[in-house]
């Protein structure tokens, strides 16, 4: 099997951890007879330093034409880095939002596992831990607050910031389907978390998921 992997080392510890991850992939390729072809692109602060933008259109096209993306770390110290003196759409994290949108990466999967042998290291109560737990937490990535309209303005002499939380039923449905598909391979249980007692977006979320 031959696969093309776009490598984004990014900023901070990104280059260090991605280099080690590539070593692991190389061992996998060696053991199972695969071939991984790596193409490096810049994203985040390192791209700003070289090109003046957090992610170029050319880099996006390379990622689109690959089978997978290996991503390190994006951004730096928000208090000291000159990147954060730029307009919000030119800061490192804007590149991350752009590539998520362009590649349709709407579902963030975060496994949470605790094995019985590690229960003493967990801050949760014993009656919650039981014999350990194995959860998959899924977060929607390309809708909601991160992609809604935003503005900062002066209202009656008071500086006011507005972020718009927007979801449509298609965005909700696709991540719900992904959650159900994953659950069918696990314990066949899905818990949808919302704030339907307050938010219209959550009421729509609950309506679609249910």
Named regions from a protein language model:
Residues 1-5:
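Extreme N-terminal starter segment of soluble prokaryotic enzymes
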Residues 6-23, 27-29, 157-210:
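Glycine-rich phosphate/diphosphate-binding loop of Rossmann-like nucleotide-binding domains
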Residues 10-12, 43, 74, 114, ...:
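Short, ordered loop/turn segments at secondary-structure junctions
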Residues 26, 30-34, 65-68, 101-108, ...:
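Generic secondary-structure signature for well-ordered alpha-helical cores
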Residues 33-57:
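N-terminal beta-loop-helix "entrance" segment that forms/cooperates
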Residues 37-41, 110, 191:
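General small-molecule cofactor/ligand-binding pocket signal
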Residues 46, 77-78, 198-200:
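Short, active-site-adjacent cap segments at secondary-structure transitions
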Residues 49-162:
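N-terminal glycine-rich phosphate/adenylate-binding segment common to multiple enzyme folds
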